[in-house]
Amino acid sequence: MKLPPLMPAIFVKRLNRFVGKVFLNGKIERALIRNTGRLSELLKFGNTVFVREKEGGKYRYEIILARAEKSLVCVESHYANKIFEEYIRRNWKFKELKREVKLENERFDFLIDNTLVEVKSVNLVKNGVAMFPDAPTKRGTGHIRTLIKLSDKFKPLLVFVVQRSDFLSFEPNCETDPEFCKAYYEYVSKGFEVLVLKCRVSLEEINVVEVFFT
């Protein structure tokens, strides 16, 4: 997936879930953060981030990437669906794809033929293990439980798009969200599939470099 033109900046402070301060072109600017996770190891004072200039909206800039020790990391969670869709259009054979499908009071990312897909964006890596979530997510837990509930009608598929390359495996973050962890392992125990996409991030693009089932 191609990225928009990016500019380097220094992260200063996160004001709330959606806005942070960055030092850019000699002054402090407010920048949009499209990610509700904590991102505490990435959005910290003094770290290098890369922003794009937006058209319209309240804030002129949006934080897209942050630098980790061994990898650039994309923190724009909405990109995960685009990355996944680009990947499947190149590698899967299917007849019909629907986006944003509402079922059982939940909205799922894709219905691909008879496969009901929920995609999660992953940014956190600890000791070589990619982990989700990095903040409690009732919505994410609800998605998994509804996937299980609907498994008599659809084939469930849970997808984690890890928007960095410096990891070897994936696990749910049980310490941060025990309820999500419980739902995840219930889903896995029933033999349903979990797909992980590893991405290599550069200043120009994000590429899927490895795909595996957990």
UniProtKB/Swiss-Prot annotation:
GO molecular function, one term: DNA binding
Residues that span the membrane, as ranges: none
Pfam short name (any one): SfsA
CDD domains in the cross-refs: SfsA-like_archaeal
NCBIfam families, per the entry: sfsA
Family listed: Belongs to the SfsA family.
Listed name of the protein: Sugar fermentation stimulation protein homolog
Organism: Aquifex aeolicus (strain VF5)
